[in-house]
Regions:
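The feature marks the mature, well-folded catalytic cores of soluble enzymes
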Residues: 7-315
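Cationic, low-complexity basic patches in intrinsically disordered or flexible, solvent-exposed regions
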Residues: 3
Length: 315
């Protein structure tokens, strides 16, 4: 029995996430295999997917698989342990960031849209390797998705929507109850929430998650889109936190193409979309190595690199 317990201890994944940029050691990368047929407009979860469904240019599975494999190769190049979901036939499993997130050594399951609940079951082989006492299910009324949650040292930054019309927005994914639940779960942290701009119809005016309009990068730098925030003072708080000279402001179109949704392997290494010329040039000016990948097809679903990764361990 002692040997069994010892083996269990060394086999468990020891979670550790305290920020967005420390050296990545283990991650769950989504999959585009067996992604299913083109959804109907009624089945679209966001305005950008709906836009490409209407235009008849919704991304093809083979193109998305190729894009994700390019990311997998870069992660392997940097010796990152990569887990993948078990493939469910005809089911979208690209955006693993939505289904769960890690803060410190806690694995927190998201309360997501009911149609997407199978996605968490598809990573059960990963969850089984986590100490069960570290797995948290938030109360049912606390709606949350990982794209809205960013640990940053003593802070946990959370995107939300505080409007009384929350239920009218399919694009509102994290509510005030979830913000409160996180503060209870991490009383030693400062949980700071940001009221995000939502639109069911115009993707250029929709911050689906916090990482669609903001992300820390490098050493004390950040990418931000002003109009993603409904409250000017909350946007200013973030700019002041990093310092104006350390913030890269992206335009409405750059937000639409998901420029703030790159992914950090380390403080000095990021994976970014190859068409983000202005951003990638700025990142290199900061001394950051930019590993460029094609990801424009996946971005048609209003998600990019951060959205399709679920980090488990950073140094």
């Amino acid at each position: 029995m002692k040997l069994f317990l010892y083996l269990m201890k060394i086999l468990l994944v020891k979670l550790n996430i305290n920020n967005e940029t420390s050296r990545l050691k283990a991650v769950v990368l989504g999959t585009a295999e067996s992604n299913g047929p083109v959804p109907s407009l009624e089945e679209a979860y966001d305005p950008k997917s709906a836009e490409f469904i209407r235009m008849g240019s919704y991304p093809k599975e083979e193109d998305m698989v190729e894009e994700m494999e390019a990311v997998a190769k870069i992660l392997e190049k940097y010796k990152v342990q990569v887990f993948r979901p078990k493939v469910i036939k005809d089911y979208n499993q690209i955006f693993t960031r939505d289904i769960a997130f890690v803060i410190e050594d806690k694995f927190i399951k998201s309360n997501i849209l009911p149609d997407r609940e199978q996605e968490i079951e598809a990573i059960s082989h990963v969850i089984k390797q986590i100490d069960p006492s570290k797995i948290i299910q938030l109360p049912e009324e606390a709606h949350i998705e990982g794209g809205d949650v960013m640990p940053l040292g003593d802070y946990i930054l959370v995107g939300t929507y505080r409007g009384a019309d929350y239920k009218d927005y399919i694009t509102a994914r994290t509510n005030v109850q979830a913000v409160e639940a996180l503060q209870e779960l991490f009383p030693h942290k400062k949980v700071v929430s940001f009221n995000l701009r939502k639109s069911n119809t115009e993707p250029r005016d929709n911050a689906l998650h916090l990482d669609c309009c903001f992300q820390p990068v490098g050493k004390g730098k950040a990418i931000i889109h002003r109009n993603g925030f409904l409250e000017e003072e909350e946007y200013n708080w973030l700019v002041n936190l990093f310092g104006k000279e350390n913030v890269f402001e992206i335009s409405r179109d750059e937000m639409y193409y998901m420029n703030s949704n790159i992914f950090s392997i380390d403080e000095d290494v990021v994976i970014s979309e190859k068409n983000f010329t202005r951003l990638n040039a700025w990142l290199r000016e900061q001394g950051i190595t930019v590993e460029e990948v094609p990801y424009a097809e996946i971005s048609k679903q209003e998600g990019l690199l951060r959205c399709s990764t679920l980090p488990l361990i950073r140094e």
